[in-house]
Amino acid sequence: MQVKKIKKRKKVNFFQKNNIKYIDYKDIELLKKFISPNGQILPRRITGTSPKDQRQLALAIKRARQMALLPYVIE
């Protein structure tokens, strides 16, 4: 019996692919792509973002939450 090996596809960095240099906290539609259904920021291993982009993304989401553009908890 042969065991099939599962190949993991490398995740593509969304921000480098679309040539986005600055993640704006006012761009709510973009930020919603990186938030889970219950309102948590998705980790790098799921989104495929680079460490630098993940830090900028988290900062932008936190700013949007403070400005009441995004909710803290989604019910």
Swiss-Prot record:
Belongs to the bacterial ribosomal protein bS18 family. HAMAP family: Ribosomal_bS18. It comes from the Bacteria. GO terms for biological process: translation. Keywords: Ribonucleoprotein, Ribosomal protein, RNA-binding, rRNA-binding. Binds as a heterodimer with protein bS6 to the central domain of the 16S rRNA, where it helps stabilize the platform of the 30S subunit. InterPro entries: Ribosomal_bS18, Ribosomal_bS18_sf. The gene is rpsR. GO terms for cellular component: cytosolic small ribosomal subunit. Coiled coil: none annotated. GO terms for molecular function: small ribosomal subunit rRNA binding; structural constituent of ribosome. This is Small ribosomal subunit protein bS18. Part of the 30S ribosomal subunit. Forms a tight heterodimer with protein bS6.
